[in-house]
Regions:
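A short gly/proline-enriched turn/hairpin at secondary-structure junctions
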Residues: 60-69, 85
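Short, aromatic-enriched amphipathic alpha-helices that serve as compact interaction elements
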Residues: 31-47
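Bacterial N-terminal signal peptides
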Residues: 13-24
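Sec/Tat signal peptide C-region and signal peptidase I cleavage site
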Residues: 26-30
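Short beta-strand edge/turn micro-motifs at domain boundaries
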Residues: 115-144
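N-terminal secretory signal peptides that target proteins for export/translocation
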Residues: 1-11
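Surface-exposed, charged secondary-structure patches
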Residues: 73-119
Length: 144
């Protein structure tokens, strides 16, 4: 094999490796997006089974505005109260960015009597949410 043929083969190999890596990254982000969509769908109806399936056993859910951090068990236990609060509500969300294994979401919670705009982050590993944080960024959803 000549030097030129070897260089072409090396370039093709590098391009193939780069494309394969890029496809894997895009697929992982798509999976994270699907998991986050499942999260909001389940959250809207307080679906304990789906939410428990989405959360890693050692997840930590940080609610900045309340100053608390919940375990998976604490979060699931609070769903009865949440179910009453979310009755008649709507949740809209959009992914703002995704980098370094963390996805940032802007979410609008349209409750019957008020609404709130939040910034939420999700760390996803092996199709489970391993960490989440939530902070209000506005008392209405005009910025959504």
């Amino acid at each position: 094999m000549t030097g030129t043929a070897r260089r072409v083969t090396n370039v093709r190999s590098a391009v193939f490796t780069f494309v394969a890596l890029l496809i894997a990254i895009i697929a992982a982000r798509a999976d994270d997006g699907a998991i986050i969509s499942r999260w909001y769908s389940a959250l809207l109806v307080a679906d304990r089974t789906e939410l428990a399936d989405l959360l890693a056993d050692d997840v930590r859910i940080k609610l900045d505005d309340l100053g608390i951090v919940q375990s998976k068990q604490e979060f699931i236990a609070a769903l009865d109260e949440w179910k009453g609060a979310v009755a008649g509500a709507a949740i809209r969300h959009r992914i703002a960015k995704s980098e370094g294994g963390v996805t940032t979401v802007i979410a609008c919670y349209d409750f019957p009597d008020n609404d709130v705009l939040t910034r939420e982050t999700f760390a996803v590993t092996d199709n489970h949410i391993t960490a989440s944080s939530q902070a209000a960024i506005a008392e209405n959803c005009e910025g959504y």
